[in-house]
Amino acid sequence: VTFSKASSKTDDERANPKRANLRTKPYVLERYLEVKPGEVLEGKNIESTMKEMYRTGIFNRIEPNITGSETDPNARNVEFLIEERPTTTINGSISYGTAVGLVGGLKLSDDNFLGRDQQAAINLEASNKGDKTFSIDWFDPWIKNTERVQAGGSAYWRESRDDDADWDELEKVKTIGTRWTIGKGLNKDIY
């Protein structure tokens, strides 16, 4: 069983060796694999593998290619041709609320961070009334070499104005903190 990047080169584009490799790490692909080397090849295992890989949301197209072996007439080689979708996004926002005023925000996120199927994000928001927020977030939906253990965290800094403060009290409230999460994914047969 092998994984290859589906060709997306157009006729007027030069071949780039960097683009020939999958961004997603091999262990991420292998953990969803239902087709095992040495076992009888069944269509339902190929379909299950494809379904689990599509469920990650980081692939546009997955095509199985089954070929015979040159040395063993009973053996089959399975190659999955994979087209990865762009997973990095930059979002900007502007909003207005009577309590916070005009708020602007910028977010940079990646749903396949470093090819490990992890989500990472940096978020920055500021308002014209003095409120500011900065956060760094990370989540791994399946920690390597575990039985679907999930973990994530967030570190944040927030500064806001206290409108109810008297003239001699502290006007700005600063908050620094973290949030952590750990969980166990259910098996693939539960929807």
Protein language model annotation of sequence segments:
Residues 2-13, 187-191:
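Short, intrinsically disordered, charge-balanced linker/junction segments flanking boundaries
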Residues 1, 5, 83-86:
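Conserved catalytic cores of ATP-dependent inositol ring kinases
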Residues 22-23, 39-191:
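Gram-negative/organellar outer-membrane beta-barrel architecture
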Residues 8-35:
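N-terminal periplasmic "start-of-domain" segments of outer-membrane beta-barrel proteins
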